[in-house]
């Protein structure tokens, strides 16, 4: 009842449409691939992550900025360990494939540097800049990783201890990198990457292609097939750690669970860690915390301890 005694109007109930993916209709699927629907504090957490990256640079100093390719965006930031021949963690940022840059994704640098590792954060074109083409992005990221392997010694890194991590669409790229045929496509050892941590990623692009994300991504059969890591587990040779939060969208939770299970079924080493009560963006923020599930997964895989 309202203050004047009149009955409140009953909210209209949305009629459910035909199923598009599993039991979800189009709106439900679109929402399941829109993290902002499930994270009301998203913009605040994103702002904190960006600010924390700035604070880390104030404490550690500016990273080395080196080019891995011919275009201005094809560069990477190196936050250097204090010891020579140190292990390397390459981070691939998220942003729904269309946002974010390396500078705003360095809050975990202090954790890794203090633990004795280099952090390398890749920059690359977003999907808007590539005209909707994910394959171009994939090639840039792959070339960035190859550059790190070939040039590791030049910045005091150990090319035999390269690990990767990523969150959101960066978690998707971790899956792609772990299932790349490095010998065939780039002429480098298939065991170049020693392990990967995929936070809140996507590993089968079919439902993503059916969602509203296809409004800005030009999904092709080639892109869907090539960039769906779960379909290429025969190429997976490194351990993978999968992390997600229970307050993420149902599809992001399912994607992580299904990928970890598929890797284990294929006889490859995989772990699944669940962050109870964390939404998508809060999972990202916790990467900088060495005692969080996400931060610990990265350190443990590299056999490092927080300091």
Pin down the residues of each PLM region.
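Alpha/beta-hydrolase superfamily serine-hydrolase fold, recognizing
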Residues: 2-307
């Amino acid at each position: 009842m309202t203050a004047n005694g009149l009955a409140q109007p009953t909210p209209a109930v949305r009629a459910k449409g035909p199923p598009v993916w599993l039991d979800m209709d189009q709106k439900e699927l679109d929402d399941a691939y829109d993290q902002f629907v499930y994270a009301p504090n998203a913009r605040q957490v994103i702002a904190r992550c960006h600010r924390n990256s700035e604070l880390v640079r104030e404490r550690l100093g500016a990273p080395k900025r080196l080019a891995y390719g011919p275009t201005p965006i094809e560069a990477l930031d190196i936050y250097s360990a204090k010891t020579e021949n140190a292990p390397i963690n390459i981070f691939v940022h998220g942003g729904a494939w269309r946002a974010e840059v390396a500078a705003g994704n360095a809050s975990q640098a202090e954790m890794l540097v203090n633990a004795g590792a280099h952090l390398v954060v890749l920059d690359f074109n977003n999907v808007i800049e590539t005209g909707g083409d994910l394959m171009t992005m994939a090639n840039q990221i792959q070339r960035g990783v190859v550059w790190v392997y070939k040039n590791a010694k030049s910045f005091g890194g150990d090319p035999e201890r390269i690990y990767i991590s990523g969150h959101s669409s960066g978690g998707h790229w971790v899956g792609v990198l772990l299932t790349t045929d490095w010998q065939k496509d780039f002429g480098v050892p298939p065991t170049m990457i020693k392990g990967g941590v995929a936070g809140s990623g996507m590993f089968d692009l079919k439902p993503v292609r059916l969602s509203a994300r296809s409004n800005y991504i030009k999904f092709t059969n080639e892109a869907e097939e090539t960039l769906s890591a779960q379909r290429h587990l025969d190429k997976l040779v490194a351990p993978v750690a999968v992390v997600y939060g229970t307050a993420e969208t149902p599809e992001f939770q399912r994607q992580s669970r299904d990928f970890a299970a598929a890797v284990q079924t294929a006889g490859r080493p995989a772990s699944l860690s669940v962050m109870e009560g964390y939404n998508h963006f809060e999972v990202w923020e916790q990467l900088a915390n060495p005692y969080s599930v996400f931060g610990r997964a990265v350190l443990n895989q590299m056999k490092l301890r927080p300091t």
